[in-house]
């Protein structure tokens, strides 16, 4: 998995929960591409699933991914083509589920405060840097420990475990 991304921002507020990310009415499927068709459907941007482009980046406030422990939520985001989610903070279970399935997530409160809907940004996960291309300003994000970077580079926890087992 690449560790640098560039995309247009979709800005969301605080407390975006898993029901907003992927509504419960779609939990009868485990097809990630079907889930992606409905991502963010019950959020403040219900048009997101139909109007976002592959590579667009979600930027949100605090407590992103709160609510029920639903692995469908990060899966829907990942398979919709969103390469990274930036937020002030993440619900802990969402954080872990995202890492496990290989969806990069970044905590950067200052960046969230200043980046606007529609801005184009660059994200470098290895350096922990976010750059707003509209303003030229760079923000330091909370950098992942090497172990989490390795899991993300592998594409998720299962892929990482397979790599580790194969190398023994």
Curated annotation (Swiss-Prot):
GO terms for molecular function: 3-isopropylmalate dehydratase activity. It catalyses: (2R,3S)-3-isopropylmalate = (2S)-2-isopropylmalate. Its EC number is 4.2.1.33. InterPro entries: Aconitase/3IPM_dehydase_swvl, AconitaseA/IPMdHydase_ssu_swvl, IPMI_Swivel, LeuD, LeuD/DmdB_bac, LeuD_type2/HacB/DmdB. The keyword Lyase applies. Keywords: Amino-acid biosynthesis, Branched-chain amino acid biosynthesis, Leucine biosynthesis, Lyase. It comes from the Bacteria. GO terms for biological process: L-leucine biosynthetic process. Disulfide bonds: none annotated. Pathway: Amino-acid biosynthesis; L-leucine biosynthesis; L-leucine from 3-methyl-2-oxobutanoate: step 2/4. It is an enzyme of class 4 (lyase). HAMAP family: LeuD_type2. Belongs to the LeuD family. LeuD type 2 subfamily. Catalyzes the isomerization between 2-isopropylmalate and 3-isopropylmalate, via the formation of 2-isopropylmaleate. This is 3-isopropylmalate dehydratase small subunit. It comes from Aquifex aeolicus (strain VF5).
């Amino acid at each position: 998995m690449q560790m640098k991304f560039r995309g247009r921002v979709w800005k969301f507020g605080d407390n975006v929960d898993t029901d907003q990310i992927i509504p419960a009415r779609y939990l009868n499927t485990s097809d990630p591409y079907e889930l992606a068709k409905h991502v963010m459907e019950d959020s403040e941007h219900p048009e997101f699933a139909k109007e976002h482009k592959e590579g667009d980046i979600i930027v949100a406030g605090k407590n992103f991914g709160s609510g029920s422990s639903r692995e469908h939520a990060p899966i829907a985001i990942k398979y919709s083509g969103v390469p990274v989610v930036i937020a002030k903070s993440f619900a802990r279970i969402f954080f872990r589920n995202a890492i496990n399935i290989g969806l990069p997530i970044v905590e950067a409160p200052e960046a969230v405060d200043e980046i606007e809907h529609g801005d184009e940004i660059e994200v470098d996960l290895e350096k922990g840097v976010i750059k707003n291309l509209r303003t030229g300003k760079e923000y330091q994000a909370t950098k992942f420990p090497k172990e989490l970077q390795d899991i993300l580079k592998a594409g998720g926890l299962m892929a990482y475990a397979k790599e580790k087992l194969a190398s023994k």
